Regions:
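Short, electropositive alpha-helical surface patch
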Residues: 170-172, 201-213
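Metal-dependent polysaccharide deacetylase catalytic core of the NodB/CE4 family, i.e.
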Residues: 32-47, 87-92, 100-200
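N-terminal pre-catalytic segment of deacetylase/amide-hydrolase enzymes
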Residues: 21-92
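Conserved small/polar residues in nucleotide/adenosyl-binding loops
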Residues: 217-220
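Bacterial N-terminal signal peptides that target proteins for export
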Residues: 2-10
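Bacterial N-terminal signal peptides
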Residues: 10-21
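Structural detector of well-ordered beta-strand residues that form the stable sheet scaffold
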Residues: 72, 119-121, 151, 211-214
Length: 220
């Protein structure tokens, strides 16, 4: 995952393949910089490409704790004025995309047990429509009350580079307004649906005063 700070600053953050065993994850971690873990579904084997077994999740968390990683919220990383600060060495943050119900029911209790902060990137259309497989606004409010934080993930979860830029702007503003209305928040970090961006979208995020954006970036 790459996190872009607009106004020129660029921070590269390594994306761990979270479907691997804890031993293989350990080999993939960058001990000299910040690592961001990205999850989607928890204990939903029907969706193997985005699911993680919660027993494997526990192994990931225990490895990081036992090896004394500096586990912080993603906002703590992004708010560092000097992105080369030694603070980033062995620093780790956790994010979850989409607000699937399985995160709230299966994943979040584990993160809470280990006292680990999580940023949840919320696609608002499915929440607003009360989709059965996604969190509700009440559950999102509970998540925030219990220490979680939220970021922007568009309203529609569409593949944005394929959209007209005016339609993207309408989509993003709708999402921002709903999050402010329902959660009382004005997030400044955005995760691109499907991890893909374009120069036009980057310019639009600047226009909307969204300071950071997450791109999908895989490493060998």
């Amino acid at each position: 995952m790459q996190l872009y700070k607009f106004k020129i600053i660029l921070l590269y953050i390594f994306l761990i393949n979270l479907l691997l065993s804890s031993a293989l994850v350990a080999q993939s971690i960058d001990h000299n910089g910040a690592n961001v873990f990205m999850y989607h579904r928890f204990d939903e084997p029907k969706y193997p490409s985005t699911n993680i077994n919660t027993e494997v999740l526990k192994q990931h968390l225990e490895y990081l704790i036992q090896n004394e990683f500096n586990i912080v919220s993603i906002n703590e990383i992004l708010n560092k004025k000097n992105l080369k600060d030694p603070f980033l060495t062995k620093t780790t943050a956790f994010t979850v995309d989409d607000a699937f119900l399985s995160f709230f029911e299966n994943g979040w209790p584990i993160f809470k047990k280990y006292n680990i902060p999580v940023t949840l990137f919320v696609s608002t259309d499915v929440v607003e429509e009360n989709h059965w497989n996604y969190m509700s606004w009440d559950q999102l409010r509970q998540f925030i009350k219990e220490g979680g934080s939220v970021g922007l993930h568009s309203a529609s979860h569409g593949h944005l580079p394929q959209y007209n830029i005016n339609d993207i702007e309408i989509d993003l503003i709708e999402s921002m307004k709903l999050i402010e209305k329902e959660l009382g928040l004005n997030p400044k970090v955005f995760a691109y649906p499907y991890g893909e961006a374009s120069n036009g979208i980057i310019g639009l995020l600047q226009k909307l005063n969204i300071n950071y954006a997450c791109l999908l970036y895989t490493s060998d």
